[in-house]
Amino acid sequence: MNLEALCKEAELSFYDDELVSENGKKIYRIYVQKEGGVNLDDCARLSEILSPIFDVEPPVNGEYFLEVSSPGLERKLSKIEHFAKSIGELVKITTNEKEKIEAKIIAVDDENITLENLENKEKTTINFNDIKKARTFMEW
């Protein structure tokens, strides 16, 4: 099953998916984006496309709930493409060496992310493979 193509059919772009357990229930979440933002009708349209397909070809074993939503303003960055689409945004990164970084994404290439330190404006480049986890954040 090609989630990216199915999202495109609903005029959305696939961002990510995850399987989580909350209160003993399995939830299969699909995150989507589109220019101008995702609304409830967009999520419902994709859910209507996916439900009959998932009835025949379930994405996970056993009983589960399907959720379709936008990844949100503060979202996980797990692919190099996520960083590329987040240029200009603030990010919290934990490296494989457990170093914590808060910076602004200023450039992305095939395997490196260039960041600007929020305090001293110093620029640094980090290899994507050196990142354990990353998430955008907003300063309120």
UniProtKB/Swiss-Prot annotation:
One of its GO terms (biological process) is ribosomal small subunit assembly. The keyword Cytoplasm applies. InterPro entries: Ribosome_maturation_RimP, RimP_C, RimP_C_sf, RimP_N, RimP_N_sf. One of its GO terms (cellular component) is cytosol. Pfam families: DUF150_C, RimP_N. Keywords: Cytoplasm, Ribosome biogenesis. Its main location: cytoplasm. The keyword Cytoplasm applies. It comes from the Bacteria. It is found in: Cytoplasm. Required for maturation of 30S ribosomal subunits. HAMAP family: RimP. Belongs to the RimP family. This is Ribosome maturation factor RimP. It comes from Campylobacter jejuni subsp. doylei (strain ATCC BAA-1458 / RM4099 / 269.97).
